[in-house]
Design a protein with these regions (language model features):
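Flexible glycine/acidic-rich beta-alpha junction loops that bind and position SAM and/or redox cofactors
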Residues: 14, 146, 190, 239-241, ...
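Radical SAM enzyme core and accessory elements
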Residues: 2-10, 31-32, 36, 47-48, ...
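Glycine-rich beta-alpha loop elements in corrinoid/cobalamin-binding modules
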Residues: 26-31, 35-154, 373
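N-terminal [4Fe-4S]-dependent radical SAM core
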Residues: 138, 142-181, 503
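A short, glycine/small-residue-rich beta-strand->loop->alpha-helix junction that serves as a flexible
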Residues: 11-21, 65-70
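Active-site beta-loop-alpha junctions enriched in small/polar residues
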Residues: 66, 94, 234-236, 266-270, ...
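Catalytic cores of alpha/beta
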Residues: 100-106, 279, 339-353
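Radical SAM [4Fe-4S] cluster-binding motif and immediate context
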Residues: 162-329, 350
């Protein structure tokens, strides 16, 4: 009897399709053990087509589940069971930890949940299913046994990541972003109260060998011609001196091999502020075009709430340091949370305006989501801002200590939502850095004028957004229930700035296309 395994990640729309390293690693590991397996990223519209396409339906289907894909995964599981009631469905991913029993109690089509690193656990799960053995004592698996739910002990994390084969990549034509993810480590040392990464990541930070990382990047470049790499490491320089030495080794290895790659990676404010200029000079030379920094807030009250262990001035210093080395700063920012006050929102606006960051209305309207493993979720339960929390609870539905702040946010959010511009702004900024550095003559002759126009629009938009939201707060406080506030927030020019940026982006990408084809 053949035993075929399919692994899936579910996304909202085809435009969201990209790599998911978890299922890629598991697929490659299972294949190295002789099992027949594939992995796919699909959206809702593709579910039926994919399930109908199997000549021999999988005996085991594994699905990555996250809080924001919960309803899609529920729907997919229901469809799977209609096609094949005997197919074993296992869910996994960072957000399932501590909610394994809850998931099985509330999702009747799911047979088991995998906790922690999935490679060895899914392999043993498959082996037991193949040989029709009990799942009792299968480490890392919580499973349904008739009317009972049995939770086995967690499997120890894979400490030596270099023993894992490089994940196979399948260039998906729907992936328009044209970059590969690189997982150089697993685990996180951050203790942010809104996040559970430090719980789900396992035993501290586990590092891969820097030479092996560069080998993987070079192999992908030779095979697919892709020179852009985004590191998934929670913090590229962790842990401590060992992590910093590894980061420098990766940079040095890239430079010595003369590999002209474009790199994006995550870091933290307190890491940036303890590094010296030589590190960022080396990063720039190695091809780092963007550091994603967990800024999160521009006021001290929220930074303390998020347990960031930094100050507003620390954030400003870190931003300046990276920008001064001609590296773009992308950033996490949570402007609204259940404890927000208008004073703190105004401080966030002041911070963004004076920070030197590129920002749009999405940054200003960003609202905290409840991560299942976060300590802030526990505080919200204690403060009765949420009545209860399950894995399928709405991660954006909670009360505010100051309900008028939520009312303000909801009113504007209905009118303005420009999430898509985060990627666009970042892409523009990174392209400017890349071509100014690597093709200065072409940049000066063909691109400089357009990027200067974009810079002007960014500056004008920053100024407009600051004044627009500052005035909106003032009017709301004075005329909360009147027509003046609603009239004011509707009569805005935000979309005009966004359209200008989109037009200029398309203008320079046409030039880049012709340039690559030898036309300019």
């Amino acid at each position: 009897m053949s035993f075929f395994i399919s692994l899936f990640s579910i996304v909202d729309t085809p435009d969201d399709v990209r790599e998911y390293m978890g299922i890629s690693y598991i697929k490659t590991y299972l294949k190295s053990k002789g099992l027949d397996c594939n992995a796919r990223v699909i959206c809702k519209e593709e579910m039926d087509e994919v399930l109908r396409s199997y000549e021999d339906f999988p005996k085991l289907i594994g699905i990555s589940i996250y809080c924001n894909t919960l309803e899609l995964v529920k729907l997919f599981c229901e469809k799977i069971k209609k096609f094949s009631p005997d197919c074993h469905i296992v869910l996994g991913g960072a957000h399932v930890m501590e909610y394994e029993v809850d998931i099985l109690s509330r999702m009747k089509h799911v047979d088991s949940v995998c906790t922690g690193d999935g490679e060895e656990t899914i392999w043993e799960l498959a082996d037991r299913l193949i040989h029709q053995k009990s799942l009792l004592n299968c480490k890392g698996i919580t499973f349904r046994d008739g009317d009972k739910i049995i939770q086995n002990e967690r499997r120890p994390d894979i400490k030596n990541l270099d023993l894992l084969p490089h994940p196979e990549r399948e260039r998906n034509p729907k992936n328009k972003k044209r970059y590969f993810y690189i997982t150089g480590s697993r685990g996180c040392l951050g203790q942010c109260s809104f996040c559970g990464e430090h719980k789900t990541g396992g035993c501290g930070v586990r590092l891969r060998d820097p030479v092996d990382i560069v080998n993987e990047m070079e192999e992908l470049w030779k095979q697919y011609g892709v020179d852009k790499f985004h590191f998934t490491d929670a913090t590229f320089e962790d842990p401590g001196n060992k992590g910093i030495e590894r980061a420098q080794k990766i940079f040095t290895e890239l430079i010595e091999r003369q590999l002209k790659f474009r790199l994006v990676m995550y870091t933290r404010t307190n890491i940036i502020n303890k590094m010296n200029n030589k590190y960022y000079d080396l990063a720039y030379k190695a091809g780092v075009e963007c550091f994603f920094v967990g800024v999160e807030s521009g006021n001290q009250g929220d930074l303390n709430l998020y347990e960031k262990k930094i100050t507003v001035q620390d954030n400003l210093k870190a931003i300046r340091t990276v920008l001064e080395h001609h590296i773009y700063v992308n950033y996490g920012f949570i402007c609204f949370n259940p404890y927000s006050t208008f004073e703190r929102i105004q401080e966030n606006l002041d911070f963004l305006y004076h920070s030197g960051l590129v920002y749009n209305s999405y940054h200003i309207l960003s609202k905290m989501t409840i991560m299942p493993q976060s300590s802030l979720k526990d505080k919200m339960l204690e403060d009765k801002l949420i009545d209860e929390f399950h894995f399928d609870s709405d991660i954006r539905d909670y009360k505010f200590v100051h309900p008028e702040v939520l009312e303000f946010h909801s009113a504007i959010y209905k009118i303005i939502n420009t999430k898509h511009l985060i990627d666009l702004d970042s892409q523009i900024a990174i392209d400017r850095i890349h071509y100014r550095k690597n093709e200065p003559l072409f940049y000066d002759q063909q691109l400089k004028g357009i990027f200067e126009e974009i810079e002007d629009v960014w500056n004008s938009r920053n100024h407009y957004l600051y004044n627009y939201f500052t005035e909106a707060i003032r009017i709301f406080k004075m005329d909360r229930n009147g027509d003046r506030f609603n009239s004011y927030i509707k009569d805005n020019k935000i979309s005009e700035y966004d359209k200008k940026i989109t037009i200029l982006y398309k203008k320079y990408t046409i030039i880049l296309y012709k340039h690559k084809k030898g036309g300019v």
